[in-house]
Amino acid sequence: MNSKINRKRRTDRNQVIYYIQDVETLEYYVGLTALSFKGNVFRTLRRRMQKHMQRALAENKNWGLSRVLRERGAERFIFGVIEVVRGKRPAHARETELINTMQPALNTFGVK
């Protein structure tokens, strides 16, 4: 008997809406990531920040956050939780709402 059961991947995982802020200019970015590391929010966000930095250095994109991470360095930025939302669709909707309301300077995709 096969003990491994194929299950549909959950789509209602907890999602973390977070900010990354430049401590000198106070410009910030709002983003979304799936909660990982068995629910450890700090480790999840620390890993996401590492990914942002890695992508900024490797891909040379002209996106707001990538550009300032390259120019100013990761040491100048702090990150934290705005809120945790259950489910991918509600989280994306909430992130879009927050971006449209808060209008963070480093979000350059113009979410509407």
Label each region the model flagged.
Residues 1-42, 89-93:
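GIY-YIG nuclease catalytic motif and its immediate N-terminal context
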Residues 48, 93-98:
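Alpha-helical scaffold elements adjacent to nucleotide-binding pockets in ATP/GTP-utilizing enzyme cores
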Residues 86-89, 106-108:
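Short, polar/flexible loop-turn hinges at active-site or ligand-entry regions and domain interfaces
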Residues 97-106:
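Short arginine-rich
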Residues 3-7, 61, 108:
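N-terminal cationic leader/targeting segments used for protein routing and processing
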